[in-house]
């Protein structure tokens, strides 16, 4: 259900992420250890992966 997808809550001034494990499932089907890491991936790859759901994919 795409209604549940949302944009990651990003602080794009951040260049590193904490190590807190709070997994989320990205719309690319990849589990990210936390939302910050999804943001960094988007920034690095110039993509706009959404948050599919909380918890692993």
From Swiss-Prot:
One of its GO terms (molecular function) is serine-type endopeptidase inhibitor activity. Gene3D superfamilies: 3.30.60.30. SUPFAM superfamilies: Kazal-type serine protease inhibitors. Disulfide bonds join 10-39, 17-36, 25-57. InterPro entries: Kazal_dom, Kazal_dom_sf, Prot_inh_Kazal-m. The keyword Disulfide bond applies. One of its GO terms (cellular component) is extracellular region. It is found in: Secreted. The record marks 21-22 as: Necessary for sperm binding. Serine protease inhibitor which exhibits anti-trypsin activity. In the pancreas, protects against trypsin-catalyzed premature activation of zymogens. In the male reproductive tract, binds to sperm heads where it modulates sperm capacitance by inhibiting calcium uptake and nitrogen oxide (NO) production. PANTHER family: SERINE PROTEASE INHIBITOR (PTHR21312), SERINE PROTEASE INHIBITOR KAZAL-TYPE 1 (PTHR21312:SF27). This protein is unusual, with respect to the other mammalian SPINK1 proteins, in having an extra N-terminal residue. This is Serine protease inhibitor Kazal-type 1. It comes from Canis lupus familiaris (Dog).
């Amino acid at each position: 259900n795409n209604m549940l997808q949302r944009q990651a809550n990003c602080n794009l001034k951040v260049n590193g992420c904490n190590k807190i494990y709070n997994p989320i499932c990205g719309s690319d089907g990849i589990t990210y250890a936390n939302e910050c890491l999804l943001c960094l991936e988007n920034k690095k790859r110039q993509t706009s992966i959404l948050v599919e759901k909380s918890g692993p994919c």
